Amino acid sequence: HRLLLERQIPHEWEVRSGGHDFACWNTALPKAFRFINEYFNGKQSGNSESSLPNETPFIQTANATVYYPEQAQGSTRKYPIIYVQGEINEQQQKVLVSQFHQMVDENKTWPAVLSFVKANTDLSETISDIEKQLSGIRGSQRMRALITLGDNIKEGIEAIQRENLFTGIVCVNAIGNENDAQNLIKAVNSHKRYPRCWIEILPESKEYGFSSNIHILLKESDLEHEFRSRKCKEANVFTYWEDWILYLNNRIHV
């Protein structure tokens, strides 16, 4: 490292504890592959401050804002995509994207495209438009997941009813009636590789009964899912953002 530094040769240097332990090598691999991939694409980051990644690239479409992973710059690689539908302003989006990229940098999860879809818009149509118009997206059921907030679960239900779009779904403070709950179960249960569900109820939610009903119906149908009812009031609805990302990305990469 000192010789490379003295000769001003671009490189990366990182000290890890663990020696020859497999876990040490395994956690180092993602960054090693990224380094090699950047070299192939003629983009070598090295240790210099001037070569640090630029601001996260994003694309604005009619009904969504799409953020690409930092690793996508200068690369032809295609990535899985996680859709998030609800009332989320631009500042909040950037905070969530930054948290996600930090998780990737810390090797907690894998890179993915994040697409924030406007509330109460046709989800299926929006997905179709995004994946036809934009490159760098692995548009398949196994590589696609959804986080839905409040009454936007109805858009998610319609999307699943039309076709099996998602490998995993996180429903946060879902709002609906008994028919919506029944429709969700029918939609999920109609696919052999059904989307796994994470049901999240935060203390401020006034629709505890609806989410509980979904949980009971999923359990009665013997469908694998997660159910979280939080007791402590948190600062904002995205306190458990990392939990949701890990759940969905693990579903994508099983």
What role is predicted for each listed range?
Residues 1-254:
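Non-catalytic cap/lid and distal C-terminal segments of serine-dependent acyl enzymes
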